Structures are given as C-alpha cells and as structure tokens.
Regions:
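Active-site histidine-anchored catalytic micro-motif
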Residues: 1-137
Length: 137
C-alpha cells in the first residue's frame, strides 16, 4: 500500500471563512501515485473543520447564518471563564466536522457532480493547517 502525506496551510482574512480546497486535494492525489484508494483530509486545529457540499454562494451564506444561530459569537460561554473567547468556534467546528474521507478511482478524486471540499475556519486570522493523507494502491 502506498501512503503519501501533505499539508495545506491557511491564514484567513476573516474570523469565519469557508475556503474551497477541492483542486488542491486533487493535485495532491495526482502526485501521490495512488490509483485506487482513499484520501483523508483533516483540519489540525480545534476551531477549524473540513466538509463536503455544493459550491454555491447562497448555500455558503446559509451555512454561516445557520451556524451563527446555533452557536452565536459573543455569548457568555463557560469556556470563556478560562480566559478564552472562542467557544462558538469550537461548537461550529463540531457541528460541521473536522475531517472527510474521499474515494480515489483511476488516480482521481471520485466526487459527485456537485460535491466540493471546503476548509471551514471559525477562529481565523492566524496560521493553521490541514493534513492530507492519501492511501491505496
């Protein structure tokens, strides 16, 4: 079995931001030499996530509004009693998930016609990374 590991780095301009990373993942898969297998894409920070969905501006906006209703910024969360101020980011990351596993077929990502991979930042404006681990034959 072949295993190839790479990293994507992010430093978003906004506190909350969704970044489409499908092309970057596809490029890593291509250079890995894996023809049949899977790729794990995992955010390596507790206030960031990775998810798969449609790349449509209205839907991205809907996600942001929905998450803000579920875990509003600025509330007096217990986590803030420890000196932190980002409990909402932890909650949003938990809702959206921190990793995805994607199929590789014939050396390419095997996604549905509308599926795209996103990095979700919920406490941004600092350097963070995503691990991309390609495994297979």
């Amino acid at each position: 079995m072949l295993v190839h590991t790479d990293y994507l780095w992010f430093n978003t301009k906004k506190r909350q931001e969704f970044v489409r990373i499908t092309d970057e993942i596809a490029a890593i898969v291509k250079t890995s030499g894996v023809a049949e297998g899977m790729v794990l894409v995992s955010a390596m920070h507790i206030t960031a996530g990775v998810f798969v969905n449609d790349w449509e501006d209205g839907l991205i906006h809907d996600f942001q509004e929905w998450l803000e209703k579920l875990a509003p910024a600025g509330l007096d969360y217990r986590h803030h009693q420890t000196g932190e101020d980002n409990a909402d980011a932890h909650l949003k990351r938990t809702i959206m998930g921190h990793q995805v596993t994607l199929p590789i077929t014939a050396g390419k990502l095997d996604l549905g016609p509308w599926e795209q991979v996103f990095y979700a930042e919920f406490d941004g404006q600092r350097r963070k990374r995503v691990v991309v681990k390609v495994m297979g034959e």
